[in-house]
């Protein structure tokens, strides 16, 4: 009896030890498919905690693996795979042309590169407007096939509110988007700021409230006057994310290419929003590097010995030259011999 009790206690002690050594967080039931270190992976809980503490939430767009890695390294809270890829990656004048399949390619690339931020994927135009069931089906694909944690949809019409509610009820986190909604430029008459008169300003606040009621965990406020954004932020219990909406939102979002000053081409210069601060002129650095590369290749400066690392031993080279000559490739043998001589370090 005593021996059996000892064995049971030993097994229980080992189980407790394993549980304490587990990398699963204490407050979760299942580990999930991703590393669940609560000090690293950003979740809705982390965003809500930041919001309660009054700490601004940082959001930046990303569209591929390198940009996602940069966001991850910088400690950005939320990585948005935006349909703005239609403009800054694919070169279109609007966000309308990009397809769901194209968005999913961007989502998967970003998911491989950003391990810390909360990942949010835009629902592209034409993939959620017809019905709530279409919206849910699209949102499910963005999570299952794109590897996202949440989705974002634009607009505040009754059908959009219903769609947002249906997506949330399907178990998918949703960010709303009001103010300037680029997918609706046909109705808005272009990329025009909203909330600049009484009716429009009230509509911004009421629409944001309706999205909150539908279950959205956050709302993007785009291109509205700061007092309107401040009113919406004060009225809501969920965080607001501003873009061209002033400093009174719960957080801010900018497009990766815009804030880095990557696009120097006149096509993009004409659509770069004036509310965007450029924190770098990466485009100039890229242009300079490409021109320098072109010049060095043209002058046969690159690649030199230091960038030609793969060597062949003298004995193997001699044998290679002999074989070339046997095959009648005397000219090729001479070229190989001269190349070997030129690759020798200068004395």
Swiss-Prot record:
Binds 1 Mg(2+) ion per subunit. It catalyses: 3-methyl-2-oxobutanoate + (6R)-5,10-methylene-5,6,7,8-tetrahydrofolate + H2O = 2-dehydropantoate + (6S)-5,6,7,8-tetrahydrofolate. One of its GO terms (molecular function) is 3-methyl-2-oxobutanoate hydroxymethyltransferase activity. GO terms for biological process: pantothenate biosynthetic process. Its cofactor is Mg(2+). Pathway: Cofactor biosynthesis; (R)-pantothenate biosynthesis; (R)-pantoate from 3-methyl-2-oxobutanoate: step 1/2. Residues 1-48 form a transit peptide. The active site is at residue 222. This is 3-methyl-2-oxobutanoate hydroxymethyltransferase 1, mitochondrial. GO terms for cellular component: mitochondrion. Coiled coil: none annotated. Keywords: Magnesium, Metal-binding, Mitochondrion, Pantothenate biosynthesis, Transferase, Transit peptide. Its EC number is 2.1.2.11. It holds the Pfam family Pantoate_transf. InterPro entries: Pantoate_hydroxy_MeTrfase, Pyrv/PenolPyrv_kinase-like_dom, Pyrv_kinase-like_dom_sf. Catalyzes the reversible reaction in which hydroxymethyl group from 5,10-methylenetetrahydrofolate is transferred onto alpha-ketoisovalerate to form ketopantoate. It is found in: Mitochondrion. Mg(2+) binds at residues 83, 122, 154. It comes from Arabidopsis thaliana. 3-methyl-2-oxobutanoate binds at residues 83-84, 122, 152. Belongs to the PanB family. Its main location: mitochondrion.
């Amino acid at each position: 009896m005593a021996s059996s009790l000892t064995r049971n206690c030993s097994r229980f002690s080992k189980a407790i030890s394993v549980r304490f050594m587990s990398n699963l967080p204490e407050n979760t039931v299942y580990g999930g498919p991703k590393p669940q270190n609560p000090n690293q992976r950003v979740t809705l809980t982390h965003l809500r905690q930041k919001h309660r503490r009054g700490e601004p939430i940082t959001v930046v767009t990303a569209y591929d693996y390198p940009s996602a890695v940069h966001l991850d390294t910088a400690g950005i809270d939320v990585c948005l795979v935006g349909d703005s890829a239609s403009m800054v990656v694919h070169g279109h004048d609007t966000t309308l042309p990009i397809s769901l399949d194209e968005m999913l390619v961007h989502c998967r690339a970003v998911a491989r590169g950003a391990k810390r931020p909360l990942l949010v994927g835009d629902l592209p135009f034409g993939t959620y407007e017809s019905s709530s069931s279409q919206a849910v089906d699209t949102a499910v694909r963005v999570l299952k096939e794109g590897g996202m944690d949440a989705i974002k949809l634009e607009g505040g019409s009754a059908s959009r509110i219903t769609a947002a509610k249906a997506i949330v009820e399907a178990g998918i986190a949703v960010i709303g988007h009001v103010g300037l909604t680029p997918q609706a430029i046909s109705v808005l008459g272009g990329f025009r700021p909203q909330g600049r008169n009484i009716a429009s300003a009230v509509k911004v606040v009421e629409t944001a409230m309706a999205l909150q009621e539908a279950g959205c965990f956050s709302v993007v406020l785009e291109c509205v006057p700061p007092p309107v954004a401040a009113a919406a932020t004060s009225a809501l219990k969920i965080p607001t994310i501003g873009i061209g909406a002033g400093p009174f939102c719960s957080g801010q979002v900018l497009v990766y290419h815009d804030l880095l000053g990557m696009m120097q081409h006149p096509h993009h210069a004409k659509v770069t929003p004036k509310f965007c601060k450029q924190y770098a002129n990466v485009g100039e650095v890229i242009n300079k590097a490409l021109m320098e590369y072109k010049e060095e290749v043209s002058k046969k400066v690159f690649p030199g010995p230091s960038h030609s690392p793969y060597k062949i031993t003298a004995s193997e080279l001699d044998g290679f030259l002999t074989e070339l000559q046997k095959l009648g490739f005397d000219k090729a043998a001479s070229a190989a011999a001269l190349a070997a001589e030129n690759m020798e370090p200068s004395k």
